């Protein structure tokens, strides 16, 4: 049984990017779809689609590469996890690589990037960092 599905999704994305795969599939859930949509809107992945087939629904995440197949994602880190939740106020949201990366937060208004949370002055649970 998987205890942290978000960490599993982030690990699959990281491993696929390091192996230079075009896409990866993860079991679908609303929170994973929301994280993937934020990664897409911030320019870290090219596309995300929910696919149905035999068995449970899956999210197909299409990775984004630049020149020389350089991945848009250099690193991913799960911050808050089931055994250690991490909460931050809006004025304490960390800047990832001086603003080159993003943090994803779970707030009372749903999942959002660190930039949106700072703009709306909302704190919450710090889900992960991507750079």
From Swiss-Prot:
Database matches in PROSITE patterns: RIBOSOMAL_S8 (PS00053)
Protease is among the record's keywords: no
Molecular function GO labels: rRNA binding; structural constituent of ribosome
GO BP of this protein: translation
A GO CC term assigned to this protein in UniProt: ribosome
Keyword line: Ribonucleoprotein, Ribosomal protein, RNA-binding, rRNA-binding
Xref: InterPro entries: Ribosomal_uS8, Ribosomal_uS8_CS, Ribosomal_uS8_sf
Matching Pfam families: Ribosomal_S8
UniProt record similarity statement: Belongs to the universal ribosomal protein uS8 family.
Role summary: One of the primary rRNA binding proteins, it binds directly to 16S rRNA central domain where it helps coordinate assembly of the platform of the 30S subunit.
Record's subunit section: Part of the 30S ribosomal subunit. Contacts proteins S5 and S12.
Name of this chain's protein: Small ribosomal subunit protein uS8
């Amino acid at each position: 049984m998987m205890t942290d599905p978000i960490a599993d999704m982030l690990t699959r994305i990281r491993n696929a990017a390091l192996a230079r795969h075009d896409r990866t599939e993860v079991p679908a859930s609303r929170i994973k779809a929301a994280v993937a949509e934020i990664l897409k809107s911030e320019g870290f992945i090219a596309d995300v689609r929910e696919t149905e087939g035999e068995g449970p629904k899956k999210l197909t995440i299409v990775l984004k590469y630049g020149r020389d197949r350089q991945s848009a994602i250099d690193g991913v880190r799960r911050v808050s996890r089931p055994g250690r939740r991490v909460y931050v106020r809006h004025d304490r949201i960390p800047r990832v690589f001086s603003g080159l990366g993003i943090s994803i937060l779970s707030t009372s208004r749903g999942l959002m990037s660190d930039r949106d949370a700072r703009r709306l002055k909302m704190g919450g649970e710090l889900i992960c960092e991507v750079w």
